[in-house]
């Protein structure tokens, strides 16, 4: 991972066409996630983020669960496109699940009442940095990934299936794998509408 930081940010894209292969070993993928979790900042050094890396049959099971959950809420006449989308995630090599440990958040709320309304917000900010960092680190290794949010539909069943503590709040799912098709051209709003410089 010796690329320029800004090159890495530019390279990170939502990649939906991925395969079961991976350009790097599972051990290296796990190490990337471990290093990010260890070093991404968190308010009060609270280290609230939790991750679960699903590979092989565990990865397949996640997307089977998601498919069946969606089947219950998406009209049958509209389901083919949903099925195609979920199968594209299942076609990947693995999935990283991102959680925040709200037992830690609630403990901090009790310790520091002045900031109690902020801790859930800060936890989500940490999670956002975590997701972006894993995603970008994967991109530098030639791994394609995207960020998905099926949490409300699958949270309870995923926790049962993979024995995940109830106090872990699921935030997102990141399927990843070898890139089959690159992302299309990205468009940008005028930078002057988004960045103000005052002197």
Language-model-derived ranges and their functions:
Residues 1-94, 199:
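N-terminal amphipathic, basic helical "cap/leader" segment at the start of enzyme domains
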Residues 5-11, 16-17, 170-199:
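C-terminal helix-cap and adjacent tail motif
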Residues 67-68, 110-118, 188:
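Short, surface-exposed, charged loop/turn segments at secondary-structure junctions
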Residues 92-102:
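Active-site-adjacent structural patch at catalytic or cofactor/ligand-binding sites
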Residues 107-111, 157, 186:
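A short secondary-structure junction signal
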Residues 159-166, 182-186:
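Short proline/glycine-enriched turn/loop segments at secondary-structure junctions
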């Amino acid at each position: 991972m010796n690329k320029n930081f800004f090159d890495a940010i530019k390279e990170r894209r939502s990649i939906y066409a991925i395969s079961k292969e991976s350009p790097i070993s599972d051990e290296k993928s796990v190490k990337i996630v471990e290093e990010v979790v260890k070093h991404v900042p968190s308010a009060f050094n609270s280290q609230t983020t939790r991750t679960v890396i699903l590979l092989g049959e565990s990865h397949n099971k996640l997307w089977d669960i998601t498919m069946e959950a969606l089947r219950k809420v998406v009209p049958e006449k509209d389901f083919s496109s949903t099925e195609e989308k979920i199968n594209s995630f299942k076609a990947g090599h693995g999935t990283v699940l991102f959680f925040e440990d709200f037992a830690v958040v609630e403990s901090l709320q009790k310790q520091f009442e002045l900031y109690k309304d902020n801790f859930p917000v800060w936890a989500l900010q940490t999670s956002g940095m975590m997701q972006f960092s894993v995603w970008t680190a994967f991109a530098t290794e030639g791994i394609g990934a995207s960020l998905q949010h099926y949490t409300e539909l699958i949270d309870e069943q995923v926790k049962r299936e993979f024995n995940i503590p109830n106090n872990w709040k699921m935030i997102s799912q990141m399927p990843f794998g070898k890139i089959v098709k690159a992302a299309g051209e990205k468009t940008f709003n005028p930078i002057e509408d988004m960045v103000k410089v005052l002197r």
